[in-house]
């Protein structure tokens, strides 16, 4: 049985501006990578946080059956949101503690739904700190953004 990891990243040129997301999915047996899959996409007008969310959503939605997966993100916004803040938001009808609407609520709801059928471990790592897999996810996010950038 292999262990599945999804390294996710979002990128934005301007905030808001054109943006992209990328996912590097790796199945590992020990240290050996036995399968690799990449995903990427983008939007013409978006934010970095929306692209970080889309990367995580896309990783989970790409899974065809219930799976144990570790999602590795450099976004504290995604990690804290999905592991901590979301519980209060759901209790409060997708409002923050000070009763304001949650930003990107439709994406948080989609992420919440996407993770329900899986056993997900969420891991945060520092971005641009020499993690090869995170750098690959960043390259994919930039490639996803490229068609939407004007020179």
Swiss-Prot record:
This is Ribonuclease H. GO terms for biological process: DNA replication, removal of RNA primer. Its cofactor is Mg(2+). InterPro entries: RNase_H, RNaseH-like_sf, RNaseH_domain, RNaseH_sf, RNaseHI. The keyword NAD does not apply. It is found in: Cytoplasm. The gene is rnhA. Pfam families: RNase_H. GO terms for molecular function: magnesium ion binding; nucleic acid binding; RNA-DNA hybrid ribonuclease activity. Its main location: cytoplasm. Monomer. Keywords: Cytoplasm, Endonuclease, Hydrolase, Magnesium, Metal-binding, Nuclease.
């Amino acid at each position: 049985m292999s262990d599945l990891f999804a390294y996710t990243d979002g990128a934005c040129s301007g905030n808001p501006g054109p943006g992209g997301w990328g996912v590097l999915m790796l199945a590992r047996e020990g240290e050996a990578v036995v399968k690799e899959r990449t995903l990427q996409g983008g939007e013409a007008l978006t934010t970095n946080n929306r692209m970080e969310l889309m990367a995580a959503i896309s990783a989970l939605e790409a899974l065809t059956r219930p799976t144990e997966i570790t999602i590795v993100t450099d976004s504290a916004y995604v990690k804290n949101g999905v592991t901590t803040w979301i519980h209060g938001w759901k209790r409060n009808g997708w409002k923050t503690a000070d009763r304001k609407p949650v930003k990107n609520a439709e994406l948080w709801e989609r992420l919440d739904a996407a993770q329900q059928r899986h056993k997900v471990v969420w891991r945060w790592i520092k971005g641009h700190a020499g993690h090869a897999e995170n750098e690959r996810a960043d390259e994919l996010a930039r490639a996803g953004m490229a068609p939407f950038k004007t020179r």
